[in-house]
Amino acid sequence: MWEQLYDPFGNEYVSALVALTPILFFLLALTVLKMKGILAAFLTLAVSFFVSVWAFHMPVEKAISSVLLGIGSGLWPIGYIVLMAVWLYKIAVKTGKFTIIRSSIAGISPDQRLQLLLIGFCFNAFLEGAAGFGVPIAISAALLVELGFKPLKAAALCLIANAASGAFGAIGIPVITGAQIGDLSALELSRTLMWTLPMISFLIPFLLVFLLDRMKGIKQTWPALLVVSGGYTAVQTLTMAVLGPELANILAALFSMGGLALFLRKWQPKEIYREEGAGDAGEKKAYRAADIAKAWSPFYILTAAITIWSLPAFKALFQEGGLLYQSTLLFKMPFLHQQIMKMPPIAPSAMPLDAVFKVDLLSATGTAILAAVIVTGLFSKKFSSRDAFASLKETGKELWVPIMTICFVMGFANLANFAGLSSSIGLALAKTGDLFPFVSPVLGWIGVFITGSVVSNNALFGHLQVVTGAQIGAGSDLLLAANTAGGVMAKLVSPQSIAIAAAAVGQTGKESKLFKRTVAYSLILLLIICIWTFILARLGV
């Protein structure tokens, strides 16, 4: 049994700085050294291994086991999800459905600023609410490329758009997890987030149009922007207040997407915006409603499948004692499972950490996407099973590098968690006293940057936020909300998100360029959250 050591140098700030070394190296590798994502991720993993074993005295066999668990998590479920999502997209392209999809979107508006709002913001948010785990960024970015957007720009815009919806991904799991850690109801934490996230949700559509066409774009499309921002923010806020986090994205996205489509039947900007090299807006051919519905079928089949997979009754089938429980394979990691003790104040008392590699063959989100692939293939008469498998092989060849990048990132994330590196950073930030509400979102940002997940971030730092809040007299619900909101802003730049987005638009190897496009906006949005959280704490919210 090994106990985590959070201050190996006898100075919390020095220990935190050493723990921060792998993150600083990764940032340097992408921005200054301009390494490819896979090399930057591998070297970051090597640096974190050295820091964990040498500085934080983690036994070598436990460090190796934690890395292997992380790499396994990168393959399943994350790599599986990305592979299935891109495969579905490729089938939609190869069956000719995108010609009709492009025309149907152009029929709503040929203006790329408005197409960005429909697909990059609304549809992105809808998929985030239904699936999460990289699916919305992969699908919506690929759709934008088909509509004539430049690949890296499409990926960056979808990453930035995700700031409005990332807290409520996969039926609200991040908020539900944070609430459990803080001994709150999901509705309580959701209502606290009402004070923070709707402000960001309202700003994001304006930011997206500004990035595409500067102030000219905002001036020319402000009525549509008000429909999207106002509708999305109002419904998201109302849902958070009345129903909780589960449907906050889905209802808001459906309302704003439907509202914008109806509004654009009566209003269009005087000047149509198309990016240079984007070509025309798509075929002007009038398709039958049945043809349009069939073209969009891969995505509403995907939505239906993910919705079914998210139902409590369906999930119950895979729980212990459930009919399909045996379909989930569990592997306890040697030298790691319950062999490391998380210590106070990170945990209420010394507690062993579980380390189980879970292969949920049927209940995984990737399997829901696979079901959508199968149904789509069955209804595509001119697309044989041989064509489908050839497309899968092509997808695998394209994605093996980004999936390995994700594996290395997850290896680092797991190592940072099990070695106590993340906790060391968190404890140093918690020493800021009355200023902690200002830095509380920064802790969430670091958590998501490391793990790539708002859920994992809340599980990692949620208790620390609660403990620190009790020490300084700040509400635990506000700090948990800050941890969640700050974490969402890191989804714009987390290595996992960057790798998925780059792969989805065929730009693997250009992760550093994509990172540079999003990092400034991630930090600006984080600063807004920090200032606002500090103000709310001073007001006693």
UniProtKB/Swiss-Prot annotation:
GO molecular function: lactate transmembrane transporter activity; solute:proton symporter activity
InterPro entries, per the entry: Lactate_perm (IPR003804)
Membrane topology: Multi-pass membrane protein
Alphabetical UniProt keywords: Cell membrane, Membrane, Transmembrane, Transmembrane helix, Transport
Keyword set includes Transcription: no
Main location (coarse class): membrane
TM region(s), chain numbering: 13-33, 38-58, 67-87, 125-145, 156-176, 192-212, 222-242, 243-263, 298-318, 359-379, 399-419, 435-455, 519-539
One Pfam family linked to the record: Lactate_perm
One GO cellular component term noted in the UniProt record for this chain: plasma membrane
Subcellular location: Cell membrane
Induction per the UniProt record: Strongly induced under anaerobic conditions. Activated by ResDE, Fnr and ArfM.
Stated role: May play a role in L-lactate transport.
UniProt similarity note: Belongs to the lactate permease family.
PANTHER family per the UniProt record, alphabetical: L-LACTATE PERMEASE
The protein, known as: L-lactate permease
Lineage, top ranks: Bacteria, Bacillati, Bacillota, Bacilli, Bacillales
Gene symbol of the encoding locus: lctP
